[in-house]
């Protein structure tokens, strides 16, 4: 089962890197409201622009922690908990602005990955 956990950690980390490093400035069908990039999305949510960088830092550090957890197990649980909390927040933001459910799916999938990682790591 440990290899399943590692696979989920890698998938979650790569997903975060994809969204926050590769697609940060790109329009996607999952952006909140009518935002065309990450900074606009946070403004749509009513958050200050500095929140983009704080949340981004936390998500990227969580992803790095999940990868480091393959070698140093004690990174896994704190990283997965933090990332799960951030995904709950992301889902809440979509609800706040009454986005269609489809836009919440990536956050919910990432939340499910984090819960699975936590269950396997416990």
Residue ranges, per PLM feature:
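Membrane-interface extramembranous regions
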Residues: 1-122
